[in-house]
């Protein structure tokens, strides 16, 4: 997969893995899986999620292309399972100015995966359920979804992209 334009400011940088035959070592996936990750280009640039180690090189190439020489301000981590969060520490090392956004449980799991020193406390933006983060024209709002899959899962929406019709 290469970079996909989702909108004028949002780019898909995820990777399609057609070589994997079992998801989580037990569920057949005859056509593979997609590791979804996005870059939001605004006054401050945010990367949403990383990908599995299997796809690191292609993903980093996509991220580099999407950033076009700029540096991200934030990495938003929605879920720490390795197929989503395997490259958190790697990306943080590549961009030492970048802050990492997650909830308290996210960082607890991150320390278990990468060690407490992987993401320095001053680089962590710990969000609460319903809090928002402005990138400029885009404002990300975080909604916790514990046990949708794992206890730390959260989702993000950008209200500027939601279109609601007026009642008739």
Task: Show where each model-derived region lies.
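Conserved small/polar residues in nucleotide/adenosyl-binding loops
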Residues: 162-168
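Active-site metal-binding motif and surrounding structural segment of the metallo-beta-lactamase
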Residues: 54-101
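Zn-dependent metallo-beta-lactamase
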Residues: 1-44
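Metallo-beta-lactamase
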Residues: 4-8, 102-153
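Divalent metal-coordination and catalytic microenvironments
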Residues: 9, 40, 49, 79-81, ...
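Active-site beta-strand termini and strand-to-loop segments that position acidic
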Residues: 40-43, 135-136, 158-160
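Active-site-proximal beta-strand elements of phosphoester/diester hydrolases
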Residues: 10-15, 47-49, 139-145, 165
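Structural motif
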Residues: 45-46, 74, 162
């Amino acid at each position: 997969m290469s970079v996909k334009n989702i909108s004028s400011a949002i780019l898909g940088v995820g990777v399609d893995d057609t070589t994997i035959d079992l998801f989580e070592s037990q569920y057949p996936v005859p056509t593979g899986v997609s590791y979804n990750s996005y870059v939001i280009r605004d006054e401050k640039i945010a990367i949403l999620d990383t990908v599995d180690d299997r796809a690191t090189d292609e993903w980093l190439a996509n991220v580099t292309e999407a950033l076009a020489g700029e540096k991200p301000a934030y990495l938003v981590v929605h879920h720490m399972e390795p197929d989503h969060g395997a490259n958190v520490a790697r990306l943080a090392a590549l961009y030492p100015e970048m802050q990492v956004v997650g909830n308290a449980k996210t960082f607890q799991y991150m320390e278990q995966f990468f060690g407490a020193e992987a993401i320095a406390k001053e680089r962590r933006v710990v969000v609460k359920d319903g809090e928002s983060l402005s990138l400029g024209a885009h404002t990300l709002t975080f909604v916790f979804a514990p046990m949708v899959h794992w206890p730390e899962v959260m989702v993000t929406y950008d209200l500027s992209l939601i279109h609601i019709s007026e009642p008739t």
